[in-house]
């Protein structure tokens, strides 16, 4: 077999002076064996007057709901953006409503179906929905039918069989 000199690549030997060889960790001789005890607390760092105390959330009257509840009420445009996010992730939008926006126990001391963990579904899940305006229209319809109820939108992943997002779309006044 005949090999052309133009086709043969030239091999250069590796240069050893480019990177130093790994010699392991530094020896413990470089580190002090004993430490001097520092009992002088005046040398501790201090933030001085820069500290401002945070208040706790009031336990009465200002309850928090679900995702995004720390924000002001969402506008229709904000709701549409959230629903678009839900649809981009291939989640099925569902609309639910409830008189109470919180978990409560009314019928029994032990948890059960009617203790507020499950909300009533508004119609059927919106399988095949591709437009946020369809979901917003259903929310508006639920608000008209039940103006004194909370309305929320959930995103259900039908492949994993889990609820992936849930947020309040309407709070009664």
UniProtKB/Swiss-Prot annotation:
Species per Swiss-Prot/TrEMBL record: Lemna gibba
Domain of life: Eukaryota
Presence of keyword Flavoprotein: no
Gene Ontology biological process terms in this record: photorespiration; reductive pentose-phosphate cycle
Protein name, per record: Ribulose bisphosphate carboxylase small subunit, chloroplastic 1
Keywords: Calvin cycle, Carbon dioxide fixation, Chloroplast, Photorespiration, Photosynthesis, Plastid, Transit peptide
Boundaries of the annotated transit peptide in chain numbering: 1-52
Factors inducing expression: Accumulates to high levels when grown under continuous white light.
Description of how the protein assembles with itself and partners: Heterohexadecamer of 8 large and 8 small subunits.
More info: This protein is coded by one member of a small multigene family. The basic functional RuBisCO is composed of a large chain homodimer in a 'head-to-tail' conformation. In form I RuBisCO this homodimer is arranged in a barrel-like tetramer with the small subunits forming a tetrameric 'cap' on each end of the 'barrel'.
Chief place where the protein resides: plastid
One annotated GO molecular function: ribulose-bisphosphate carboxylase activity
Gene Ontology terms: cellular component: chloroplast
């Amino acid at each position: 077999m005949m090999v052309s000199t133009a086709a043969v690549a030239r091999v250069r030997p590796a240069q050893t002076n480019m990177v130093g060889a790994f010699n392991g960790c530094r020896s413990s001789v470089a580190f002090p064996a004993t430490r001097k005890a520092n009992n002088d607390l005046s040398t501790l760092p201090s933030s001085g007057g820069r500290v401002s105390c945070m208040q706790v959330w009031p336990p009465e009257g200002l309850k928090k709901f679900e995702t995004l509840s720390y924000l002001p009420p969402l506008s229709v445009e904000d709701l549409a953006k959230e629903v678009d996010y839900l649809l981009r992730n291939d989640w099925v939008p569902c609309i639910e409503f409830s008189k109470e926006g919180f978990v409560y126990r009314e019928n029994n001391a032990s948890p059960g179906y009617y203790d507020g963990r499950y909300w009533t579904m508004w119609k059927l899940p919106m399988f095949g929905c591709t437009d946020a305006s369809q979901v917003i229209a259903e929310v508006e319809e639920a608000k008209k039918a039940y103006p004194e109820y909370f309305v929320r939108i959930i995103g259900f992943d039908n492949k994993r069989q889990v609820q992936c997002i849930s947020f309040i779309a309407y709070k009664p006044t």
